[in-house]
Amino acid sequence: MAKKVLAMVKLQVQAGKANPSPPIGPALGQHGVNIMEFCKAFNARTADQEGMVIPVVLTVYQDRSFSFITKTPPASVLILKAAKLAKGSSDPKKIKVGKITKAQVEDIANLKMVDLNAKDMAGASKIIAGTARSMGIEVV
């Protein structure tokens, strides 16, 4: 018989830097999860992606055990990294803060393809380009 699911917890955590302090501690503590066990497992799984923000979906079972799935970094983080920027524009329609090439957009779309709601690379590239435009970054 399958374990009964108690909760699904979604977090965005720096790769390799999970620790029991907020926001991780309170989010997992209220469900009775062993926080240090999660932190060690997460840090081991994401050690090769140092410096990236990694979304994680944690499934907590009724016996207080857990499993988790790591996803690809958010498109906005990948776009900022490609454009070598710290943050996007405060007014994206008027103020453009950087540029990325179509090749960079395609690379990001290829990386994000598993998490995007797109049937092909062209659709995925359009999604990534739209995200870049909404951040005040031009696609050239």
UniProtKB/Swiss-Prot annotation:
Free-text description of this protein's post-translational modifications in UniProt: One or more lysine residues are methylated.
GO biological process, one term: translation
CDD domains reported in the protein's UniProt record: Ribosomal_L11
Superkingdom assignment: Bacteria
Entry's family note: Belongs to the universal ribosomal protein uL11 family.
Subunit and interaction comment: Part of the ribosomal stalk of the 50S ribosomal subunit. Interacts with L10 and the large rRNA to form the base of the stalk. L10 forms an elongated spine to which L12 dimers bind in a sequential fashion forming a multimeric L10(L12)X complex.
Protein name per UniProt: Large ribosomal subunit protein uL11
Gene source species: Desulfatibacillum aliphaticivorans
Lineage of origin: Bacteria, Pseudomonadati, Thermodesulfobacteriota, Desulfobacteria, Desulfobacterales
